[in-house]
Each structure stands twice: as C-alpha cells, then as structure tokens.
A protein has these predicted regions:
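Accessory alpha-helical/coil subdomains and C-terminal extensions
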Residues: 162-221
C-alpha cells in the first residue's frame, strides 16, 4: 500500500472507498466554531489540520507536539475558538478531535468540558485525520485528499507492510519531512493540502520535492545509526538515538530487528535538552510494537510503560511515548526493562 512514481492504482482504488466506521458526518451548522487549528506536527496532524482548514480556510494553523502541550507551552494559544487535532486533551479548547487511547477525556472531564461549551469527538479511528475527514466529508471538498488518506491511516496505526516500508514511497518520505522544528515548512504543506493540491501537485512542489529527496538521502545514515546503536534485550529492541540529532519511528528499528523483537524502545533527545527548544528537546522514549510480525500488534499495552513514570506520557497501546524522568535514563530504562521482563502479567492485553 504505497504511492510510487506516477501510477498508484491500488491506493487510488482504496482511497475512493469511504471507510465505514459508524461516524456520523456533521451538518454544516453542527460544526463547532473555530478560528485556530492546533495540530500535532506529524503526518496525521498535518492531514487533520488540512481537513479542518479545507472546511474553514480563514482559520489559522499552528503545529505542536504532545509533550509541549502537556507541558503548558501552548496554553496561550488554546481557547474556545481553538480546535485540537491529534494532540492530548486540553479543557480550554472549543473542539477536541482525537483517537489516542490515553488522550481520551474521562467521564468527569468530558462532562465538565461539555458543560463549559466544548465539543468532543473521540473515536478509535486509524488516524485523527481520518476522524476529521469523516466528520466533514459531506460538507467539504476533499476529493484531492481521498487517495492519500489510506497511507495516513496506515502510518499512524501500524498498518504499513515491511515491503511498503522498504520501498519507501513518496508519502512515506513526506511523513519524515513533517517536524515541529520547521513551522514555516509545515505551514507550506498545510496550505498546499487545504488549498486543493492532490498527490501529483504536492510531490511536484519544489519545496516538498527537495525535502523528500533530503530525507530519502538521510535514511541510509539513520539506518547505519540504528544498526550500530541498537541492542535486543529479551525480544525488546532498544535503540539509542539520544545525543545524535537523529529521529525515527518504530518502523525502521523493527524492520532491522526482524523476528528477533516483539517491540522496540527508541530513546531520543538530549540530556541537557529543553522542551521549548525544538532543535534540542529533552530525553524521551518511544515504544512501538513490531507491526511487521504476524499478530505483532495488540499483544501488549505498551502505553503502560509510557505512563509508568511520566504522568504526561501516553499514546496508543502499540505506539506511545514519554519523557525521561528523574533520576535519569538509566533508572528509567531499568524500570521499563523490568516491566518488559514481566510483560505476560504487567503488559498483556
């Protein structure tokens, strides 16, 4: 499932078919008012923001990430005129659109939010962008996005096959260009997508084309780093990317580990990093199930590891993350490895 070259019939066929998820599309008068869109700075957040801006072109778009929002860095930008997509819940927003299990407001939070005038749409869709897309599908012109949505879904839900990952098609490359470190570029992307750019127009854009070529070339260097800095401990691939400047999701590490690992833990960031510095963030850890294995997902709830030491950690059971907590990485890693060693009782779903 990948768009490559000039022809992509399989994905185009998939994209023309609306997913049946029981989501009731909104009527125009049912859409909550918003003037600002705050989205995660990954592929899912990008497409979620594009959908929301396609419906309301005059809305401004900002990109952030989960740790920044939970750390209070986005508070000044969140009010009842703000829609949050693909980010943790914030009670001050006006409309909340998400699909992460650990982000879902509990009953008390949801009731207080609704009583204060907020609107919540939380569903366990493959991506938050898919939820936004289905909600606005009947009142927004989005045919240009339709063929790309299956890749957005697959990337965010662990649905990329190993063959597709190794092929590294243009949309997979595009996903690696998404970053909170370059808000100008992210704004360029969302303007293209919200403005009607289809796959061909997107990939023909000089800025996008150059970024995709750059990450394509960089992948070999990241692969070498993974090979040199990953160990497998009791079927958990532990990859140290901290202090390197490199970043990766779980696909690259689990592809390297193959059938030797059921999951991976990737350490990113810097020991002296700061949450407000996108170029030098603090130490964090991400946990991913090996989705390339048959039945590799849904065996263990990795979000329990992400929330064990960091109350602001979380995500999905198969893909999640957290910040490293005092006294430091070594102690945190010891705790996570102990949980993993007892996974059949501590993490088993």
């Amino acid at each position: 499932m990948v768009i490559t070259g000039g022809k992509h019939p399989t994905l185009m066929d998939m994209g023309q078919c609306r997913l049946s998820m029981g989501i009731v599309p909104l009527r125009r008068e049912e859409v909550p008012p918003y003037t600002r869109i705050l989205a995660d700075s990954d592929m899912d957040g990008l497409f979620g923001a594009a959908v929301l801006k396609a419906f309301r072109p005059e809305a401004t778009v900002m990109f952030s990430h989960a740790a920044a929002l939970r750390g209070g860095l986005d508070d000044e930008h969140i009010d009842r005129n703000t829609v949050l997509v693909d980010l943790p819940f914030h009670p001050s927003c006006g409309w909340y659109v998400d699909h992460h299990l650990t982000n879902r407001p509990d009953q008390q939070e949801a009731a207080a939010f609704a009583a204060g005038g907020g609107t919540q749409h939380w569903e366990s869709t493959p991506s938050a962008a898919r939820l936004a897309y289905e909600l606005l599908a009947e009142i927004t012109e989005m045919e240009h996005l339709t063929p790309m949505m299956p890749v957005v879904d697959a990337l965010d839900s662990g649905g990329i096959s190993k063959e597709t990952f190794l092929e590294d098609g243009p949309l997979l490359q595009l996903s690696r260009t998404c970053t909170s470190r370059d808000p100008v570029y992210m704004q360029h992307l969302v303007d293209l997508l919200a403005g009607g750019a289809d796959f061909e127009a997107l990939m023909a854009d000089p800025v996008v084309s150059e970024r995709c070529q750059r990450v394509k070339d960089e992948r070999a260097a990241v692969q070498r780093h993974v090979e040199a800095n990953t160990i497998i401990v009791d079927r958990l691939a532990v990859c140290r990317m901290d202090e390197s400047g490199f970043r990766s999701n779980g696909y690259l590490v689990t592809a390297w580990a193959g059938d030797r690992a059921d999951a991976c833990c990737i350490v990113h960031g810097y020991a002296d990093g700061d949450l407000s510095d996108a170029d030098r963030p603090p130490l964090s850890a991400s946990f991913y199930a090996n989705s390339f294995l048959p039945g590799g997902q849904g065996r263990y709830d990795l979000s329990r590891m992400a929330t064990a030491l960091d109350s602001t950690g979380g995500g999905h059971v198969n893909a999640c993350g957290c910040r490293v907590q005092p006294p430091g990485l070594d102690a945190n890693m010891e705790h996570w490895l102990d949980m993993w060693a007892n996974r059949e009782t501590v993490l088993k779903i």
